[in-house]
Amino acid sequence: MAEITAQLVKQLREMTDAGMMDCKKALVETDGDIEKAVEYLREKGLSKAAKKADRVASEGVVSVEVASDFSKASLLEINSETDFVAKNEQFKELVAKTSKLVHDHALSSTETLHTVSVDGMEFSEYLQQNIAKIGENIVVRRIVTLETKRGAIVNGYVHSNGRVGVLIGIKFGKEGSKSACVELARNLCMHAAAMKPQVLSYEELDPEFITKEKVALIAELEKENEELKRLGKPLHRIPEYISRSELTPSVLKNQEQKLREELKAQGKPEAIWDKIVPGQLERFIADSTLIDQRLTLLGQFYVMDDKKTIAQVLEAKGKELDDSIEIVDYVRFELGEGIEKKACNFAEEVAAQLG
């Protein structure tokens, strides 16, 4: 029979969070085989893991997996309780294995993930084992997989700190455009990681939300204008509109007519109006879509060329390739967004863990 040393018992206890005597008994029953001892203690380990599930997991990592032919990409967020555990090698192995599992099975639902087999068991059981070994609550919070057909690609990017991940799918018409679209999608993913657009297009913004945001935005600009006025600096223009969704054909037609009347009043020759009006109308649209510039990917100015919006970048790339280029999918995960972490003092936290 193998010798059951104190060091072996300690190692098993650290792996499973089970009691000292339970660990010793498990090692005796399994003749000192620590892997079998972990299996022997699974139910006790699961009991410990269940207690850990009450604790908030708001740290962790965002992971991206992209197929070599850019036909498929997966994005997932796995949460732990502390940043320390998120840097643990065992946790990293869990993330890598889960990411590959999600990608290989093209999963977009955590419910489905928990029923998929890994290492000879359902993922839910595999996860509980890792919770017991690592010693913290771990949650696969959300997953998504994007798949494309011929004439489209999907690419992804995860920021070096593992806190932000983005997937973008682009559709094109000519096979020769593929490599350029792969590169463009990667660059746009990096833009989105930094600039935090919430949705792809203004069409996804709820009208009621826009109305509320307009009130808040105007109040913000008026407050800033008070300070600018005090400093003797130019004031912000207070917009009548803040989203492209508000710029109906009649609004744009009326604005164009207003611009022509202004040019007439200024004595500008009518022959040059058609050269001036488009630029002024474009400026009006830019000044009237402030919420789109903040919250929508297509409405934001590109970080690599701040003279163009992402929509204009796509249009320019399409002309360059003599093709039609369109973003068809956009997903962005930021670690812990929307998770409310409980406030707890140190003494309470220790008592909770002991109890």
Curated annotation (Swiss-Prot):
InterPro entries (UniProt xref): EF-Ts_dimer_sf, Transl_elong_EFTs/EF1B, Transl_elong_EFTs/EF1B_dimer, Transl_elong_Ts_CS, UBA-like_sf
Localization (cell): Cytoplasm
SUPFAM superfamilies associated with the record: Elongation factor Ts (EF-Ts), dimerisation domain, UBA-like
Gene Ontology cellular component terms for the protein in this record: cytoplasm
CDD domains noted in UniProt: UBA_EF-Ts
Region (Involved in Mg(2+) ion dislocation from EF-Tu): 82-85
Swiss-Prot/TrEMBL keywords: Cytoplasm, Elongation factor, Protein biosynthesis
One term of GO molecular function: translation elongation factor activity
Chief place where the protein resides: cytoplasm
UniProt xrefs under Pfam families: EF_TS (PF00889)
Similarity annotation: Belongs to the EF-Ts family.
NCBIfam families assigned to the protein according to its UniProt record, in alphabetical order: tsf
Biological role: Associates with the EF-Tu.GDP complex and induces the exchange of GDP to GTP. It remains bound to the aminoacyl-tRNA.EF-Tu.GTP complex up to the GTP hydrolysis stage on the ribosome.
Protein name: Elongation factor Ts
Gene: tsf
